[in-house]
Amino acid sequence: MSQIWKIPAPGDIVWYLFPEIPDIKPGPKPRPAIVLSVERREVGDQVSVIYGISRHLMRLKTGEVAITQAKNPAAYALAGLAYDIKFDFKVIVNLPWSDRYFKVPARNPYGNTPKIGTLHATILRAIETAYRAALAR
């Protein structure tokens, strides 16, 4: 598949269909993800993303971080979120940067792209802590 969008940067928040493991077929429900890394390849760009979920926000486990409107309105706004979310750094998947997995949400301020926002500087320490904790497990 040809490249249809600009490649995201680490720290961007994108809209995607979390794959059903182990098949890696796109799941049914779009959700936000943090871009951890990007690998440029001749056969197509690969993106490592961190799983986002809106459930159980009050029970953060090791390797998880939440972005909520009440606790950090600046980070919430810059992330482009429509609802509070937590990201689980224990669930990282590598996916091709294509319209099979990534979708353009309705009313996207960034235009015709899956990017919905980016991480705010005030949340970076919590992000790093969650990432390191997940690696240590």
What are these regions (language model features)?
Residues 24-30, 35-75:
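Compact nucleic-acid interaction/catalytic patches
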Residues 69-137:
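C-terminal terminal-subdomain/extension
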